[in-house]
Structures are given as structure tokens and as C-alpha cells.
UniProtKB/Swiss-Prot annotation:
Compartment annotation: Cell inner membrane
Pfam assignment, any one: Glyco_transf_28
Membrane topology qualifier: Peripheral membrane protein
Organism for this UniProt entry: Methylobacterium radiotolerans (strain ATCC 27329 / DSM 1819 / JCM 2831 / NBRC 15690 / NCIMB 10815 / 0-1)
BP GO terms, sorted: carbohydrate metabolic process; cell division; cell wall organization; lipid glycosylation; peptidoglycan biosynthetic process; regulation of cell shape
Organism domain of life: Bacteria
Binding positions for UDP-N-acetyl-alpha-D-glucosamine per the UniProt entry: T15, G16, G17, N126, R169, S197, Q299
InterPro entries, per database record: GlcNAc_MurG (IPR006009), Glyco_trans_28_C (IPR007235), GlycoTrans_28_N (IPR004276)
Gene for this chain: murG
Name of the protein this chain belongs to: UDP-N-acetylglucosamine--N-acetylmuramyl-(pentapeptide) pyrophosphoryl-undecaprenol N-acetylglucosamine transferase
CDD domains, A to Z: GT28_MurG
Main subcellular location of this protein, as a coarse class: membrane
SUPFAM superfamilies named among the record's database cross-references: UDP-Glycosyltransferase/glycogen phosphorylase
Entry EC number(s): 2.4.1.227
Organism phylogeny: Bacteria, Pseudomonadati, Pseudomonadota, Alphaproteobacteria, Hyphomicrobiales
Length: 369
């Protein structure tokens, strides 16, 4: 007797912000005995080579933005070619449902699925719906959200909205078990700095100069872990060596970032959806610097959710100066009780079972066909 095993097709662009929640959902679906396939773009190899999918389909994509009409037209043509490939692959895979995680690379496979009448679920990680998801929302059966309140959902999108939270990687769930590390007046102060999956030049420019401005006694207690873009690594390391900072670890990427978050007293970072959700789940206070150039200011909206409950301080990039950061670090480390309260506030906003919640939504939506 042949046993039918349903397949769910996950569609996510090849950056960590989209792939990490898709990876978490894949683990949750596979635990239910469901086969998982992944449709993505060519960047995936550098981010998630061990994605738990039975097969990975690479579909050409592009982002139709920028000022050049020729580049926009070229992007539309690329998306059109991707649509043709996606439609062919969907007929072959025959998924019971398709889940899109946002970003223009998901448009060809999700749109093809909608036209082929495959149930589609959109997961919006940010507090503002991205343009790709907004374009696809009208044809979705269900819209799952990472934040309780999401702006920018089109009026014509009639699908039910379900707040699942953002699915978390197993390493984040494990890190969330670690209590906030208490510290006394003479203890080491552990600061983690990172700029998201693609790094952030501003962190390499501002943070070293802020550290140089700290009081000597405070700087001597500092244990700093900082993600630095490869092209900036030597300059940043030399700057810290010049100021005699011993407890410093700088690298372009940390595979064990969740564990490093859990070991930290304070985090300085961008405010992508995955970062904000992981900070909440692990329960760590943060100084968040939203990416200023995002089309819909989604990172500013994400940061505002933690700022509003006292779990983080949101600082606009023009205000993120060495002087401002040095002052904030000095104030934070001078008041351990305030940091502990911020950690508790962050943890109160965390959703640890988001992957299971989203898996349930996917299974229920697929079953309604």
C-alpha cells in the first residue's frame, strides 16, 4: 500500500531574514511527517546550505526598484521568466499548499500557485507588510503575522489574519532557556553588536569610537563581541587594539549568534523582524538602530514594538553617533536593575512556539481544499 505524504512548498528569498523563519517552519512540518520543498533564489547557498527540505528549487528573481526604467523593466522580465519556471515546478511537485515569506523572490512561485489554485499562506515577519506580500495578499487563503499589529495590509486582502509570531530557529529556543546574567559593580560587562545577516557598515564606524569615549573603568570591564563586515574587519580590530581593549572578538559572521545573545547583558543591532523576535524570545535588552533606507520603514516599526514596552531603545541612524552611543552605554551599565527590567519586558513579548502555530495554520489551510 502506498502512503500519501503531502508536500508543502516554502518560498523564501535567500537572506537570513526570510530563510530563518522558513527553516523553522520546515522543521515543524517535518516533525509532523510532512514533506517540505523550498523555492528560493540564487543567494541561498551562502545562507542556508543545510535547509531541511527534500528538494530546493532555484527560481530567477529580481527587485523592480530604483530609478532606472531599464533596470526596472529588466527586473520585471526576470520575474516573468521566474513565473514560467515556477509554474512548471509547482505542477511537478504538486504541493498541498504554498507558504510565502515575503521578498520579491517569492512572487513568481506564490503567484503561480495562486493562478494554479494551490492554497497559499503568506507569512509577514515585519510590523509593516512588505510590498511583495502586499502584491500577493489578495490571492492568499490565510495571512499569518509575526507581530500582533501589522500596517500596510491592502484593503482588498480578505484572507483571515492570524498572529502566529515569527518562527524561531532551534538554537534560539535553546538560548531562550538561559536567564538574564546578573552583574555587580566589578563584574565583566558583555556587549554584543551585530548588523543583521548582511552586516552594517555603521556599526563598524560608530561603535569603536563610542567605546573609545567610555570612562576608563567601564571600558576595562567590557567584553565585546562584534559582527563586522569583511572589508571593515582589519580597521575595526586595529582601532580596538589601539585603545588597549583586551576583551574583544570581531568577525564577519557568528554561527552561534543566539548563544552569544543569551550570554550578553546588552545588544546593539539593527531591527529586522528575526532580530527583534529573537531578542524578545531570549529576553535581552537592546539599543536598536533601524535600517534607514528600507522602502516601508519596516525596521523602525519593528523596533518601536520593543521600545514601547521598555525592552529596547530605538535610535534613528542620524542620531546614532559615537557620543550618543557612549552616553547610552554608560547609563545602561550604571543601572543593572534597569537592564534587568528591560530584559524581563523583552521576554514578555516573546513567542516561543511560533513555528508550531504557523505549522498548524498551514495544515488547516491545506485541509480546507
Amino acid at each position: 500500500m502506498t502512503v500519501f505524504t503531502p508536500t508543502i512548498l516554502l518560498c523564501a528569498g535567500g537572506t537570513g531574514g526570510h530563510l530563518f523563519p522558513a527553516e523553522s517552519l520546515a522543521h515543524a512540518l517535518r516533525a509532523r511527517g510532512i514533506r517540505v520543498a523550498l523555492a528560493t533564489d540564487a543567494r541561498v547557498d551562502s545562507i542556508a546550505s543545510e535547509f531541511p527540505a527534500s528538494e530546493v528549487v532555484t527560481i530567477a528573481s529580481a527587485t523592480p526598484s530604483g530609478r532606472s526604467p531599464l533596470k526596472r523593466a529588466g527586473a520585471v522580465l526576470t520575474l516573468g521568466r521566474g513565473f514560467g519556471v515556477a509554474a512548471k515546478e509547482i505542477r511537478r511537485i504538486n504541493p498541498a499548499a504554498i507558504v510565502g515569506f515575503g521578498g520579491y523572490p517569492t512572487v513568481p512561485p506564490v503567484l503561480a500557485g495562486q493562478i494554479l489554485r494551490v492554497p497559499t499562506i503568506l507569512h509577514e515577519q515585519n510590523a509593516v507588510m512588505g510590498r511583495a506580500n502586499a502584491f500577493l495578499a489578495r490571492g492568499a487563503r490565510t495571512i499569518a503575522t509575526g507581530f500582533k499589529v501589522v500596517r500596510g495590509v491592502p484593503d482588498k486582502a480578505r484572507a483571515p489574519r492570524i498572529h502566529t509570531g515569527n518562527p524561531l530557529r532551534p538554537a534560539v529556543i535553546e538560548a531562550a532557556k538561559v536567564p538574564y546574567p546578573a552583574f555587580g559593580p566589578d563584574d565583566a560587562l558583555r556587549l554584543l553588536v551585530f548588523g543583521g545577516s548582511q552586516g552594517a557598515r555603521v556599526m563598524g564606524e560608530v561603535v569603536p569610537e563610542a567605546i573609545a569615549r567610555l570612562p576608563d573603568a567601564l571600558r576595562a570591564r567590557l567584553h565585546l563581541v562584534q559582527q563586522v563586515r569583511p572589508e571593515d574587519l582589519t580597521a575595526v580590530q586595529n582601532r580596538y587594539l589601539a585603545m588597549g581593549l583586551a576583551g574583544i572578538e570581531a568577525a564577519p559572521f557568528f554561527k552561534d549568534l543566539p548563544a552569544r545573545m543569551a550570554a550578553s547583558h546588552l545588544v546593539v543591532s539593527r531591527s529586522g523582524a528575526s532580530t527583534v523576535s529573537e531578542l524578545a524570545a531570549i529576553g535581552r535588552p537592546a539599543i536598536l538602530v533601524p535600517l534607514p533606507g528600507s522602502l516601508d520603514q519596516d525596521q523602525a516599526a519593528n523596533a518601536a514594538t520593543l521600545d514601547a514596552i521598555g525592552a529596547a531603545l530605538a535610535v534613528k541612524q542620524p542620531d546614532f553617533t559615537p557620543e550618543r552611543l557612549a552616553a547610552e552605554l554608560t547609563a545602561c551599565f550604571a543601572t543593572p536593575a534597569k537592564l534587568t527590567a528591560a530584559a524581563d519586558a523583552a521576554r514578555s513579548a516573546g513567542i516561543h512556539d511560533a513555528a508550531e502555530r504557523l505549522a498548524e495554520v498551514v495544515v488547516e489551510t491545506a485541509a480546507r481544499t
